[in-house]
Design a protein with these regions (language model features):
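Nuclease catalytic cores
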Residues: 23-32, 43-47, 51, 55
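A short acidic/basic microdomain associated with nuclease active sites
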Residues: 59-76
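Intrinsic disorder/low-complexity segments
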Residues: 1-25
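Acidic pyrophosphate-coordinating catalytic loop
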Residues: 75-81, 134-135
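Nucleic-acid nuclease catalytic cores
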Residues: 99-145
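Conserved catalytic cores of phosphodiester-cleaving nucleases, focusing on short active-site segments
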Residues: 42, 65, 86-104, 115
């Protein structure tokens, strides 16, 4: 299942430039974009608002992504749509989940790990725009560490 999922994303990105940035460099660029959004909007809005503004910021920085990506589950050879959706997958390397919650907690980390396992990606950024400072609302979840 996950190989087909990644192949689908690669096909989507085929019209864009080469993707040779390492995950660490991409995550820094994504975090920089989220800080810019947070600087202009501050905390207190809905997740979808922050997601839309983050998308705008990433586009302005020529960072390629897909938005609201369905993440299927394979069970006994059947691919099932269980309602999982990644907010963003950036350059087929970094999964981004936008949050506007009091605090990132274990359920958010578990969701990130589940999405990473289902997509064969290694890095998820949980971006909580409800934090007073964006750096305090940013959590890196890495699969396999």
């Amino acid at each position: 299942m996950s190989v087909g999922f990644i192949e689908f994303l690669v096909q989507d990105f085929s019209m864009f430039r080469d993707f040779e940035k390492p995950e660490n460099q991409l995550s820094q660029a994504i975090i920089g974009a989220s800080i810019e959004v947070h600087k202009h909007l501050g905390p207190g809005l809905l997740e979808k608002t922050y997601e839309a503004c983050l998308v705008h910021e990433l586009l302005g920085r020529n960072i390629c992504f897909v938005r609201q990506v369905p993440i299927p589950v394979t069970y006994k050879g059947q691919t099932l749509d269980c309602g999982f959706r990644a907010d963003l997958i950036v350059e087929n390397k970094v999964l981004v989940e936008v949050k506007a919650v009091a605090a990132i907690n274990d359920i958010h980390r578990a969701q990130a790990l589940t999405y990473l396992k289902l997509t064969d990606l290694r890095l998820c950024l949980l971006l909580n725009f409800n934090a007073v400072l964006m750096r305090d609302g940013t959590v890196r979840v890495v699969l396999g560490l």
